[in-house]
C-alpha cells in the first residue's frame, strides 16, 4: 500500500478498499522502521495522526469527502501547525509548539488529509544539501552516503522512501526542485503568490513559495489543487479564480515549443546530467514537441544577485528571534543586550549566521546602493530574459543541478561551491516563475537526475501536462530505492 501514488490511494479510499486509519498505520510503521537510517522525519505523533485518520474515515463514511480525504502526508517543518512542534530545523525553535496553523496546513486539513509527521530541513530553509539541520543531515534513500538536496531534503527523502505519498515543501532558490531531482521524485514550485505564505516561516519573503513533492506530476497537480488559493492574510497572495491543475494532463504535446537555454548546457554541466536531459528532450520530440535554442544571458549573475537579496531579507526576517517571547533563550546573561547576543549565538547554526552577517552588511549604510540595489536591478534583467525567451517557446527545459547528488560532507567546508550548485534554479525564483523537477534518469553511480521544466507565469497546468506526458512515456518516476 505504501508504494501507491496519491491518485491510487484516493481511489482506494473512495472505494472503501482501505481505511484512512489502516493507511496511516502502515505509513507510521514504515517511518518507525526506516526513518532512523534516513533522518527524514523529525516529529511523529501517532495519537494525533490516528485521530485525524478516524475523522477522515468518518467523512468518507458520511459522503462528505473531497478528492484527497484520508490521504496521509508530511509537512515540511516550517509550516506552522497548531499543536505540533514547528522547529524550522533550528535549535532556536526546538521548543516551539505553534499556536496556529499555516494557510497550507489549513487547506490540507480542510481537504481531510492526515498528518503523518514533520519533515527535516536545512535550518530556516538555508541550504542546498540538508546538512544544516539542528537535527542532523538527511540521508538520500538511493545512497545513504549522498545528500538528498535542500532545503526540503526531508520532504523529498520521505516521498522517495515511501514514508509518505506526498509532502509539502518550499522553494526560495531551488529547495523543492533540487531535492526532488536528487531523490528521484517530482516537485513543483508554483508562480510566486499562488500558494499563501501565511504561517510559512519566512526566509526571504520575496522569493519563498510553497509547493508539493510527490511521486508523479499527476499527484503534484492534485496536491496543488489543495495548496493553492487566495489568502487575505498574505499580502503577496494573488487573487485569482480557482484553477484545476489536473485539467490539461492528457493534452497532446503536438506543436509544443520547448526552449533550451544555451547557458544551461555550458561548461560545468556533468556529462551524466547532460545525457539525461538530452534523452528527455528526445522523448518529448517523439511526443510531438519541437526544440528551439534560446538564450538567458544573465544566468550567471543569478548567484551573486540571489546571495545578496536572500540574505538581506533573511537578516530582517530573523531579527525577530531574540528569546523574549518564544523560542530558545540563553540561560545565563547579564542584561537584555547580553541575552539577545547569547540567545542568537546559541540558537542559530553556522550557515544561518553567515547569511545574517552578509544580509546585514549589504543593507548597511554606504553599501545598500553598491550591493542590494544593484542586485535588484540584475533581478529585473533576469526577469526580462525570461520574458523574451517565452516569446519563442512555451516551456523551458534544462538540468536542475550541475551534477547528481554529491556526498555528505563533500562541500560543507566550502560555501561558495555549495552555492554554485543552485546555478540553474535561482533565476526562476528571482523572476517569480513556476519551475518543476521530473525524474529523468540516473548517473553512472546510481543517483537520480531530474529534468527541470520552467513555465511562464501561471503556466503550472501546462508544465504539469508536459511532465505527465513525459511520465506516461517513461518510467523513471516509478523506480523506488531498495531500503
UniProtKB/Swiss-Prot annotation:
PROSITE patterns: AMIDASES. Gene3D superfamilies: Amidase signature (AS) domain. Keywords: ATP-binding, Ligase, Nucleotide-binding, Protein biosynthesis. It holds the Pfam family Amidase. Belongs to the amidase family. GatA subfamily. Its EC number is 6.3.5.7. The active site is at 76 (charge relay system), 151 (charge relay system), 175 (acyl-ester intermediate). Allows the formation of correctly charged Gln-tRNA(Gln) through the transamidation of misacylated Glu-tRNA(Gln) in organisms which lack glutaminyl-tRNA synthetase. The reaction takes place in the presence of glutamine and ATP through an activated gamma-phospho-Glu-tRNA(Gln). GO terms for cellular component: glutamyl-tRNA(Gln) amidotransferase complex. This is Glutamyl-tRNA(Gln) amidotransferase subunit A. GO terms for molecular function: ATP binding; glutaminyl-tRNA synthase (glutamine-hydrolyzing) activity. It catalyses: L-glutamyl-tRNA(Gln) + L-glutamine + ATP + H2O = L-glutaminyl-tRNA(Gln) + L-glutamate + ADP + phosphate + H(+). One of its GO terms (biological process) is translation. It is an enzyme of class 6 (ligase). Transmembrane segments: none annotated. Heterotrimer of A, B and C subunits.
Amino acid at each position: 500500500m505504501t508504494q501507491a501514488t496519491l491518485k491510487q490511494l484516493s481511489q482506494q479510499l473512495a472505494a472503501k478498499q482501505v481505511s484512512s486509519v489502516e493507511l496511516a498505520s502502515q505509513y507510521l510503521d514504515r517511518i518507525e522502521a526506516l526513518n532512523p537510517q534516513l533522518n527524514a522525519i523529525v516529529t511523529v505523533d501517532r495519537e494525533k495522526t490516528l485521530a485525524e485518520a478516524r475523522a477522515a474515515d468518518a467523512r468518507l463514511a458520511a459522503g462528505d469527502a473531497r478528492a484527497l480525504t484520508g490521504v496521509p502526508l508530511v509537512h515540511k517543518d516550517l509550516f506552522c501547525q497548531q499543536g505540533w512542534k514547528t522547529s524550522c530545523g533550528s535549535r532556536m525553535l526546538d521548543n516551539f509548539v505553534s499556536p496556529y496553523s499555516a494557510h497550507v496546513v489549513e487547506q490540507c486539513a480542510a481537504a481531510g488529509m492526515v498528518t503523518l509527521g514533520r519533515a527535516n530541513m536545512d535550518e530556516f530553509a538555508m541550504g542546498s544539501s540538508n546538512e544544516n539541520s539542528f537535527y542532523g543531515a538527511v540521508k538520500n534513500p538511493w545512497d545513504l552516503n549522498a545528500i538528498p538536496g535542500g532545503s526540503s531534503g526531508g520532504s523529498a527523502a520521505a516521498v522517495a522512501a515511501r514514508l509518505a505519498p506526498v509532502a509539502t515543501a518550499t522553494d526560495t532558490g531551488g529547495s523543492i526542485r533540487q531535492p526532488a531531482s536528487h531523490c528521484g521524485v517530482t516537485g513543483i514550485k508554483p508562480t510566486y503568490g499562488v500558494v499563501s505564505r501565511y504561517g510559512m516561516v519566512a526566509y526571504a519573503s520575496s522569493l519563498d513559495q510553497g509547493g508539493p513533492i510527490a511521486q508523479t506530476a499527476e499527484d503534484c497537480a492534485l496536491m496543488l489543487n489543495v495548496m493553492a488559493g487566495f489568502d487575505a492574510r498574505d499580502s503577496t497572495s494573488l487573487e485569482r479564480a480557482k484553477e484545476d491543475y489536473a485539467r490539461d494532463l492528457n493534452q497532446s504535446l503536438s506543436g509544443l515549443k520547448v526552449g533550451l537555454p544555451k547557458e544551461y548546457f555550458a561548461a560545468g554541466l556533468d556529462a551524466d546530467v547532460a545525457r539525461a536531459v538530452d534523452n528527455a528532450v528526445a522523448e518529448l520530440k517523439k511526443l510531438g514537441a519541437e526544440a528551439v535554442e534560446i538564450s538567458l544571458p544573465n544566468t550567471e549573475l543569478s548567484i551573486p544577485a540571489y546571495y545578496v537579496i536572500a540574505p538581506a531579507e533573511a537578516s530582517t526576517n530573523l531579527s525577530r528571534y531574540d528569546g523574549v517571547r518564544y523560542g530558545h533563550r540563553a540561560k545565563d546573561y547579564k542584561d537584555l543586550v547580553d541575552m539577545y547576543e547569547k540567545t542568537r549565538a546559541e540558537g542559530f547554526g553556522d550557515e544561518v549566521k553567515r547569511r545574517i552577517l552578509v544580509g546585514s552588511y549589504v543593507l548597511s549604510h554606504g553599501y545598500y546602493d553598491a550591493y542590494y540595489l544593484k542586485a535588484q536591478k540584475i533581478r529585473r534583467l533576469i526577469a526580462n530574459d525570461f520574458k523574451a525567451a517565452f516569446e519563442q517557446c512555451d516551456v523551458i527545459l534544462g538540468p536542475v543541478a550541475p551534477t547528481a547528488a554529491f556526498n555528505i560532507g563533500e562541500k560543507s567546508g566550502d560555501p561558495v561551491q555549495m552555492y554554485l550548485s543552485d546555478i540553474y534554479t535561482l533565476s526562476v525564483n528571482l523572476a517569480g516563475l513556476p519551475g518543476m523537477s521530473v525524474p529523468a534518469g540516473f548517473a553512472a553511480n546510481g543517483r537520480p537526475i531530474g529534468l527541470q521544466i520552467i513555465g511562464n507565469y501561471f503556466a503550472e497546468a501546462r508544465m504539469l501536462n508536459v511532465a505527465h506526458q513525459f511520465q506516461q512515456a517513461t518510467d523513471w518516476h516509478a523506480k523506488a530505492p531498495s531500503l
